[in-house]
Amino acid sequence: MDDRPPPHPEPSASDSDSDSSSENPLASISPSEIRVAIFCALPIESVAVRYTLDEEYQCRPPRHHPQSKYVFTYGRIGEHKVVLARPHQIGPVKAALCAAAVSGLFPTVRFALMVGIGAGIPGKRDIRLGDLAVGVPRENHPGVVEYDLGKYEKDGFVLKGALNKPHPVLVSADGALEEEEIMGRRPLRRVLRELMRRPGYGRPDLADVLYDPGFHHVNKGEDCRACDVADDSKVVARPVRAGKRGYPVVHRGLILSGRGVIKNPEDLDRLRRGQDDAICFEMEAAGIVDEIPCLVIRGICDYADTHKQDGWHRYAAAVAAAYCKAVLCKIDGPEELEDPVKQRTGDAFGEDLRLDADWCRRPHLE
């Protein structure tokens, strides 16, 4: 399966305007009403997020602004008006340019979420395809680190430099969702079920196989059918998961972000050595988190190896989009800012956002 969007392509801004004006015009909002930015790198990711919007809007940011070359989607999730942005290309540099554009065009944006697919890092944690990786800060890391800035030493890979942490209210909302999980509830159930009805976004009927790191993909450029006939010694044995089959498990920890795609098992082993909390590789977050406080959410679509797992891409994107909505619906809508400059000063804007105590009574997320 390729990375093209579903059969109904994502409409351009001009298409949306023409269709909506003749049939069902979109309501208009001001750029100053937008408080949340959502970033996606691939069309399949942004389409998954659009499917979770409770409402779409029209919005006209200043055309004279030097960063107005991007086309955005505007909508509402829960009580939050959001701008959905997609860089022109993948990678941290393009992501940073897009984040800077969002900051310039929408100065009232308080925080962001990076939503999409990523490569799981199997090891001490039982990470499976279709699971979730969330970059949550710990005492020894901010939730996301840029592995391009580190260096290899004899004891493993040593990370250098530091990136900003996600906004505290996003971390608190994630913690509230973790409490729901511990209590045996499934906060993603309804949203994910609705997403899985969309063309191409259902859970694939494919085996989730973790191959031995030393076993390279057979027949480059093709799927893993030739790999599947290998003897059992090439496959990592894993127990059947308890609980509801197929429901994603959320893994919280360190996300490694960089410019290159990790496929070499030796590089993977060196990077994760000494980084016990590392759960996922991805390529854009490092360009965003220093521009806007950002929570990184990735659906696991492969294991950072040479084996092709393209059939999991859209489902992994759907899982990430569902979790993004769950996080935002945990947070009350922000009050109007008296001084927009305060939003860039860390804790200054934490006072305007409160966790929603009525989470369990939200019917659309039961």
Regions of interest found by a model, annotated:
Residues D2-D352:
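Intrinsic-disorder/coil detector with helix-boundary
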Residues L353-E366:
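Walker A/P-loop-proximal flanking segment of P-loop NTPase domains
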